[in-house]
């Protein structure tokens, strides 16, 4: 009598969801206080002027202004440059 042994179950088939990391506000974009500029694991980008860093390394704007990227000594910094107030006409 021919018998077929029971098939074992696969131990694969799992994967985690994407975490939606990356730049959320690119260079030249206007931001307001609290806007998230970048989500990251570790410090791929470092906070520059007027940028804060959360406990999960999220970078966020502290003031209203324009996002700027600049590299210095093997690090990329993200800053927010304030926009000059427009003169009343």
Curated annotation (Swiss-Prot):
Keyword terms, alphabetized: Ribonucleoprotein, Ribosomal protein
Any one Gene Ontology molecular-function term assigned to this protein's record: structural constituent of ribosome
One annotated GO biological process: translation
Stretches for region Disordered: 1-21
Cited InterPro entries: Ribosomal_bL27 (IPR001684), Ribosomal_bL27_CS (IPR018261)
Any one Gene Ontology cellular component term annotated for this protein: cytosolic large ribosomal subunit
One Pfam entry name: Ribosomal_L27
UniProt cross-references to PROSITE patterns, sorted A to Z: RIBOSOMAL_L27
Protein family membership: Belongs to the bacterial ribosomal protein bL27 family.
PANTHER family in UniProt: LARGE RIBOSOMAL SUBUNIT PROTEIN BL27M, RIBOSOMAL PROTEIN L27
Name assigned to this protein: Large ribosomal subunit protein bL27
Originating organism: Bradyrhizobium sp. (strain BTAi1 / ATCC BAA-1182)
Gene this protein is translated from: rpmA
């Amino acid at each position: 009598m021919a018998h077929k042994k029971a098939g074992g179950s696969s131990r694969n088939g799992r994967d985690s969801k994407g975490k939606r990391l990356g730049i959320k506000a690119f260079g030249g974009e206007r931001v307001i206080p609290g806007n998230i500029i970048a989500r990251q694991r570790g410090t791929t980008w470092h906070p520059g002027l007027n940028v804060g860093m959360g406990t999960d390394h999220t970078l966020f704007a502290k003031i209203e202004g324009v996002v700027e990227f600049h590299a210095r000594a093997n690090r990329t910094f993200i800053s927010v440059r304030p926009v000059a107030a427009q003169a009343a006409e």
